[in-house]
């Protein structure tokens, strides 16, 4: 959602904002907007179906297989990513003035987008912490208690994410663009700040996003990777090489995307605080920030590949979902029971043979006893 700076604003009877003095977009800002639209379109077309397929497979699998803490964290990650991708079409069309909404609708989209992004990054941190506990073998043996605790942690994550996203809807409104012709009149959802709020409210908002979406995930992932590599040296070479390659792919792909994002957000926060509020500086900063805000959306396209399709367990369950086995819980449980005891018919035949042998031997002993018994008087 675009951030607009202006002064001398007025509200009409529909609570639509009319700004009399704003900066005209520069050529660089227009190019950045087109690039953002193209990248987000690719993310929607690829990341949306992938997250839907992965989330559906995970939910169906949780009905049959016992769900552990990592499984629930993965399910929450795919749900948060799918929710983020779902908001992108509205944001793209609204930024281009091709769709309009009420101020309440814009506020709902804003809080949903920022909360789902925050929940996604928080879930990645939870997955790292859970793997840290697995390495230390400090997982809870009580499955029921651990599952309840996991649900409580996820509820706390979403509550915290909503609290972190709550400042955004406060400044979200609808901007009415008054054109020369009726066809050129349109509305867009924006985050509006007056010039007097730039170095206070907007700077705080930028710093909060930089910390929650940038610094904290990078620090968490870097710490986990260094600790995991140190602990992995104690294991065998075969297990170490396979596990290290998998974890390196996860962590390094995250850091390659996230580290430039942190640098750009730190620069953006510095520019908001130190630069003068002029049209040239506003357009330059907005062009950089516009490309930086597609980085959180990139994770929605990469997470299903890294955390789902690169794993053997998920690929096995995905094939079960394609063949329709996960849709019938009774059928799947019967097949799993049959796999566990493949020699049941042979065992039953051997048991019947033993019973027949015992019956024949018992009949012979009874005949011998009856033959040796004295006749009745």
From Swiss-Prot:
Q: Which domain of life is it from?
A: Viruses
Q: Which residues lie on this side of the membrane: Cytoplasmic?
A: 62-71, 130-151, 227-246, 312-377
Residue ranges in the Extracellular topological domain are 1-33, 95-107, 171-206, 271-287
Name the GO cellular-component terms.
Answer: host cell plasma membrane; membrane
Alphabetized InterPro entries for the sequence: CCR1-9-like, GPCR_Rhodpsn, GPCR_Rhodpsn_7TM
Pfam families, sorted: 7tm_1 (PF00001)
Question: Its topology with respect to the membrane?
Answer: Multi-pass membrane protein
Q: Where in the cell is it found?
A: Host cell membrane
* KW Membrane (keyword) present: yes
Which CDD domains does UniProt cross-reference here? Answer: 7tm_classA_rhodopsin-like (cd00637)
The record's annotation in SUPFAM superfamilies points to: Family A G protein-coupled receptor-like
Q: GO molecular function terms here?
A: G protein-coupled receptor activity
Matches recorded under Gene3D superfamilies: Rhodopsin 7-helix transmembrane proteins (1.20.1070.10)
Q: Answer whether the UniProt record assigns the keyword Membrane to this protein.
A: yes
Q: Which residues are glycosylated?
A: 20
- Role, per record: Plays an important role in vivo, in particular in the dissemination to or replication in the salivary gland.
**Protein name (Swiss-Prot/TrEMBL):** G-protein coupled receptor homolog M33
